[in-house]
């Protein structure tokens, strides 16, 4: 796995061949999220795949946790990336809704489905 200066770890498990996601783009993804403990994938807490509905957001716009804003940038459409997100780039000391405990490390598998560049519908 690659590690960024912020502490995010990522690995492209399936490189994409399409357009590259950049800050300011609107992106559509499928994802599954797990808690991670001691470097091991734990309990699944959310999955757009299970719901059958992709998730769309503005990349780099602060609409998602920082680990996603950083980790999805540079992906190419059709690609799948595993992100290991430290608490500081996730939900921090507050956790989230009783589902994600405080100071949790998160692991996501993210598949980039589409990119709409800023200024383009």
Can you name each region flagged by the protein language model?
Residues 1-121:
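Cross-family detector of peptidyl-prolyl cis-trans isomerase
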């Amino acid at each position: 796995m690659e590690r960024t200066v912020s502490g995010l770890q990522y690995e492209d498990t399936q490189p994409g061949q399409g357009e590259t996601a950049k800050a300011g783009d609107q992106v559509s993804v499928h994802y599954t999220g797990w808690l991670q403990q001691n470097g091991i994938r734990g309990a699944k807490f959310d999955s757009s795949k299970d719901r059958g509905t992709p998730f769309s957001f503005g990349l780099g716009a602060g609409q998602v946790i920082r680990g996603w804003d950083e980790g999805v940038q540079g992906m190419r459409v059709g690609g799948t990336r595993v992100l290991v997100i430290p608490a500081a780039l996730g939900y921090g000391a507050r956790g989230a809704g009783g589902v994600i405990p405080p100071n949790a490390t998160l692991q996501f598998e993210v598949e980039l489905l589409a990119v709409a560049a800023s200024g383009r519908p």
